[in-house]
Regions:
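Short basic helix-loop element that most often maps to the first helix and adjoining turn
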Residues: 3-22
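Short amphipathic recognition helices of helix-turn-helix/homeodomain-type DNA-binding modules
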Residues: 59-63
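DNA major-groove recognition helix of helix-turn-helix/homeodomain DNA-binding modules
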Residues: 43-58
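Recognition helix of helix-turn-helix/homeodomain-like DNA-binding domains
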Residues: 25-38
Length: 63
């Protein structure tokens, strides 16, 4: 699933490890999501959206 996590992280000066710690997953999980190798669970998608104060639909594009 396409996403703009790298851009959102960069805007906040966050590393993958920083984001992973903030949402309670491993850095490898964030890396896999960013590279479109893993689709996050609904719970994780909500946690990511909350971290960036946006809607899930604004962050993830299923196309």
């Amino acid at each position: 699933m396409n996403n703009d996590l790298p851009e959102r992280r960069d805007e906040r000066g966050m590393s993958q490890a920083d984001l992973a710690a903030a949402v309670g997953v491993s850095r490898q999980t964030i890396n896999a999501i960013e590279r479109d190798r893993y689709d996050p669970s609904l719970e994780l998608a909500f946690d990511l959206a909350a971290e960036f104060d946006c809607r899930i639909e604004d962050m993830f594009d299923p196309n």
